[in-house]
A protein has these predicted regions:
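Symmetry-related core transmembrane helices of the 12-TM Major Facilitator Superfamily/SLC fold
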Residues: 63, 158-177
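Short amphipathic helix-loop junctions that connect adjacent transmembrane helices
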Residues: 8-24, 228-246
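Helix-to-loop junctions at the C-terminal end of transmembrane segments
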Residues: 38-54, 151, 259-275
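Glycine-rich segments within core transmembrane alpha-helices of 12-TM secondary carriers
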Residues: 32-37, 126-151
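C-terminal ends and interior cores of transmembrane alpha-helices
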Residues: 61-88, 282-298
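Pair of pore-lining "gating" transmembrane helices in MFS-fold secondary transporters
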Residues: 1-17, 99, 204-226
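C-terminal transmembrane helical hairpin of 12-TM major facilitator-type secondary transporters
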Residues: 274-317
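Juxtamembrane intracellular "pre-TM" segments in multi-pass secondary transporters
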Residues: 184-213, 237
C-alpha cells in the first residue's frame, strides 16, 4: 500500500503540481527507490547469519518498515523544499533521502519473504507466496481507492495528512501481522548457509539459471519503467487531477490480480508456465503501444483500459 503513495501520488505531485523536472523525479523516486533492491540478496544472506534480540527476521522487518514510514511521512516536505531550490546539491541530498527509503523497503520485504520461507514447508511455500502477492494487490487496490477519495482536492496539507496517516497505518498493520510469527531463539544452532560468493557462483555456472535471471530482469525492468512516469503522464497529457491519476494504481492492481488468478487457475494447467509467461509479455508490449496511442488520441477511456491491460499482462507474466 505504501508504494501507491510513493510511486502513485508523490511522483505526480512533484512533477505536475510542484513543477520539478521529470528527469529529477525519475532520479529520486525511481532510481533512488529501486536501487535499494541491490541490497536484497546480500541482506537476505546477512539476516540468515545474524540475529537481533533472538530474532532472525522480525526486527529487520520492523526496522525496515519504520524507516520507510518515517521517510514517507517526511517526503512531502522534502519535495516542496526541493521544488523551491532544485540545485544540484539539494537534488543530491534528496537522492540520498529516497535511496534510504528504497533500502529500508527492500530490507523489510526481503526479511518478510525469508520469514515466509522459514514458516512454511516446500509444499506450502508456493500457495503461501501466491496468497501474499494476492493480498498485496488487494492492498494496492484499497489504498488507491482511499487515496483517490482523499485527494479529490489537492492541497499540501491534505497530502501531508495522507502520507502521515498512511505511514502510521502501515506500521500498525506490520506489527499486527508479525505478532508471534517468529519464536525468539538465542542459542539454538542454525545450519550455516552457503557463502554469498558460492551462491552467486552457482547461479553463474548454471546456464538455465542465468537465462532465467536475465529474462526476469529484462521483463521486470521493462514493466516497471512506467512506474514513475505514468501518473505525471496522466496529469500533463490528459489534464487529469491527482485523484484520477491515483486511481491508476487501482486499475493496475485489478489487472495484475486478475492476471494472476486467470493464469494460475485456468491458463497454466492447459498451456504451461512458459506459454503463459510469453502471453503476458506480448500483452505488456501491446499495452505499452496502447499507452503511446492514447497520448495522441487524448482519450482517457483508452488510457484506463490500457493500464488495466498492462496489469493483466504483468499478472500473467
Amino acid at each position: 500500500g505504501l508504494s501507491v503513495l510513493f510511486l502513485g501520488v508523490l511522483n505526480r505531485i512533484m512533477r505536475v503540481e510542484l513543477g520539478l523536472d521529470l528527469l529529477v523525479v525519475g532520479l529520486l523516486v525511481g532510481a533512488g527507490h529501486y536501487l535499494g533492491a541491490l541490497v536484497a540478496i546480500p541482506f537476505g544472506y546477512f539476516s540468515d547469519m545474524r540475529r537481533i534480540g533472538g530474532y532472525r527476521r522480525t526486527v529487520y522487518i520492523v526496522l525496515g518498515i519504520t524507516v520507510t514510514g518515517l521517510i514517507l511521512a517526511l517526503s512531502p516536505w522534502v519535495a516542496r523544499w526541493l521544488a523551491l531550490a532544485p540545485t544540484p546539491l539539494h537534488v543530491s541530498a534528496a537522492f540520498v533521502f529516497f535511496l534510504i527509503e528504497g533500502i529500508a523497503t527492500f530490507v523489510a520485504g526481503t526479511a518478510y519473504l525469508a520469514l515466509i520461507t522459514d514458516r512454511t514447508s516446500p509444499e506450502e511455500r508456493g500457495p503461501a507466496t501466491g496468497l501474499v502477492w494476492t493480498l498485496m494487490m488487494v492492498g494496492i487496490i484499497v489504498t488507491g481507492v482511499g487515496a483517490a477519495m482523499f485527494m479529490r482536492t489537492y492541497t499540501f496539507d491534505r497530502m501531508v495528512t495522507l502520507f502521515t496517516t498512511g505511514s502510521a497505518a502501515a506500521l500498525l498493520l506490520a506489527v499486527i501481522a508479525l505478532w508471534q510469527q517468529e519464536k525468539r531463539r538465542h542459542a539454538e544452532p542454525y545450519p550455516q548457509p552457503a557463502s554469498l560468493h558460492a551462491a552467486l557462483g552457482l547461479l553463474a555456472r548454471s546456464q538455465h539459471s542465468r537465462r532465467f535471471a536475465i529474462f526476469l530482469m529484462v521483463g521486470m525492468c521493462s514493466y516497471f519503467m512506467q512506474d514513475v512516469i505514468l501518473e505525471p503522464f496522466g496529469g500533463e497529457v490528459f489534464g487529469l487531477p491527482p485523484a484520477e491519476t491515483t486511481r491508476f494504481n487501482t486499475y493496475m492492481g485489478v489487472g495484475v490480480g486478475g492476471g494472476m488468478l486467470l493464469g494460475g487457475m485456468r491458463l497454466i494447467p492447459h498451456l504451461g508456465k512458459r506459454r503463459v509467461a510469453g502471453l503476458g509479455c506480448w500483452i505488456v508490449v501491446a499495452a505499452f503501444a496502447g499507452l503511446t496511442a492514447s497520448g495522441f488520441s487524448h482519450s482517457a477511456r483508452i488510457l484506463v483500459s490500457t493500464i488495466t491491460l498492462l496489469g493483466l499482462g504483468a499478472g500473467l507474466f
